[in-house]
Amino acid sequence: MNLLVHINAICLVLFLSSNTYAQNQIVADLSQENVKISTDFQGAKILLFGAYDGQEGDDIIVIVTGPKGLVTVQKKEKVLGVWVNTRKVNYINAPKYLSISSNKKIEDILNKKTQKISEIGLNNLKIRMQPGIKVENEKEWRQALTRNMLKSNLWSINENSVSLNKDALFRSFLILPSNVITGQFEVKILHYRNSKLISQQINSINVSKSGISAEIYDIAQNYSTLYGVFAVFLAVLVGWGSNLIFRKV
């Protein structure tokens, strides 16, 4: 608690004395800007804190977006009594991580039209299917994408999780799960007043691998053929060794 008090006090002093105060009316910082993923990585909890030139009733929304890329959704059907993947759809620009936090319900901050224009909300993301793919019930595929990402903790909506203090200070905890991918993450802090954007700031978090996991990842990316051959060889070796042990037993 004392640490948070000191952080808030320092943040407020920096805010009131900086040029950013006059320009953006909001300043923010992170307790950790670099996250290292090792073999025993269990996730990360990062404190976002800052100050803003606020009034009673102002709102803060924090959006953390990870690298965008290919995300595959597969459809399973029962064939001869066995569940198998029968169809798949690729989304080519889906965020691999997305967290939206706010000081209260988003619907109480922004109307549906503004949410859609600003891409705030999981259903408002402008995500495209891979060109050439034609499917029926596109809405169901999109719902499946959202459901899968929520289930894997890679997407989340965290309303009422941003704490505001005296219309001047704010803080929130950002949670990165253990299965988070590497790359540059954008942290966007939005300050609203009567549903209108007053100010904003963008910070970043860098997530990278370290130790032996980084070396394995580099080999897999840069020497994919060699890595594949080694993986097959290792699997054969383990199988042969297990068979030999059980044969002796």
Spans of features found by a protein language model:
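N-terminal edge beta-strand
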Residues: 23-41
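Short edge beta-strand/loop segments characteristic of extracellular beta-sandwich folds
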Residues: 47-53, 173-175
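Membrane-proximal low-complexity regions enriched in glycine and acidic/polar residues
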Residues: 78, 84-177
